[in-house]
């Protein structure tokens, strides 16, 4: 898989998770940071 493609996919997934979290307030700040760290680790 292309690197730009994977990064784009990860960005889209991150944005989706972020939007869902902000809308439903299911995730607190701490889990949000952990999620972001996991996403940045992919690159």
Curated annotation (Swiss-Prot):
Family matches, as Pfam families: DUF3918
Lineage top rank: taxon: Bacteria
Protein name: Uncharacterized protein YrzQ
Encoding gene, per UniProt annotation: yrzQ
């Amino acid at each position: 898989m292309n690197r730009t493609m994977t990064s784009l996919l990860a960005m889209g997934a991150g944005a989706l998770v972020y939007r869902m979290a902000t809308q439903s307030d299911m995730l607190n700040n701490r889990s949000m940071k952990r999620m972001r760290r996991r996403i940045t680790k992919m690159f």
